[in-house]
Amino acid sequence: MSHITIPEGYQSLLGLYDTQKAIGLIKTIFQEKLCMALHLKRVTAPLFVMQGSGLNDDLNGVERPVAFDVPSLNEQAEVVHSLAKWKRYALYKYGFRPGQGIVTDMNAVRRDEELDNLHSIYVDQWDWERVITADQRTLEFLQETVWDIVDAVCATSDELRWKFPELKNNIHLDREVAFITTQELEDRYPDFTPKQRENAFAKEHGTVCIMQIGGRLKSGQPHDGRAPDYDDWTLNCDILFWHKPLDCALELSSMGIRVDADALRRQLDAAGCPKRAELPFHKLLLDGTLPLTMGGGIGQSRLCMLLLGKAHVGEVQVSLWDDATVQACRNSGVELL
C-alpha cells in the first residue's frame, strides 16, 4: 500500500489536457537546454540488459530487478534500474572524447519502490553521461555542472510560465544553489534523520546540492545508500528543490563524477563486495579501457511535478496504484493519469 498526503485545499493549476500539453513542452524544452549546456548528443538506450553483465544499477543493493528468461538466447535478462554503468560503456563504444557526452530517455521498473506522492514503480528520467579528464575529477567541476543543470531547469520554468499564465504567479524557483556536504549536514542537524536534514536545509535555501553521498559519516552511518561501482562517493551529489505543494524537498537529480580504478577498489571493499571486480564491466574499468566520466539522472516526472506545482507523481505519469490511493485522489480532486 502506498502512503499518500493530499495538501488541504490543493487544486491543480492546469486542467487535465493542459497538463498533458505542458508535460510534452517540458520534455522538449528542457532536453534542448540540457544538451546545449552540457554538450550532449541523444542516443537510444536499452530497456533491459543481460543478467551477470554488471551493467545494471544495483541502487542501494537490496532492490530486486525485474528478471525474465530469453529462451532464444538461453539467458536471463533484467529490466534496468538505471543506465549509470551502461552509459559509460556506451561512451567508450562511441569513442567520445573529453567534453563530449550522451543523453537518453531512460524508462525503468523498480518493483520494490515504496509508493508515495513522489515515488512509483515506473521511473522515467533523462540519463546523461560525458567524458571528462583526470583534472576535472574535483568538487569544483561537479559544482559547475550543477549550476548548468539548475540554469536549464529555471530557464525551462521561465518559458513554461510564459506559455501558461496560470503558472506565472504560483511557480517560483530559486536560481541560487546552496552547496553542503553530507557530513556538514549531519553536523548542522545532529538529531535529525537524513531526510529531515534535507528538508530543513532545502526549506531554508530553496535550491540545494547535497554532496558526498554513500560513505560512512562520523555517526557511523551513511547519509544514503549508493552502489559502490558508479559514483565516486567523495565526488557525487543530489540536487533538490523546495516543493511548496508538499512542503518538502523534492530530489530532482542524483549525479556524480564516476569511480576511477582506485575509487572502485576502495568502494567495493567498503561495501563488502570485492568479487564484483571480476564482472565484465568492472574489468574494463579497472584495466583503464573505459573513459573517465561524470553523469546522472534527472527525473522527468519529478521535473514536471516541480514546474507544474503538482502534489502527486500520478498526475504527470501513468503507473499502478492501490485502491486506497486512487480513492483518496478521487475524493480530493487529484486526477491521476
Regions found by a protein language model. Give the residues of each.
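A glycine-rich phosphate-binding loop feature that marks nucleotide/adenosyl-phosphate handling sites
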Residues: 47-51, 165-172, 322-326
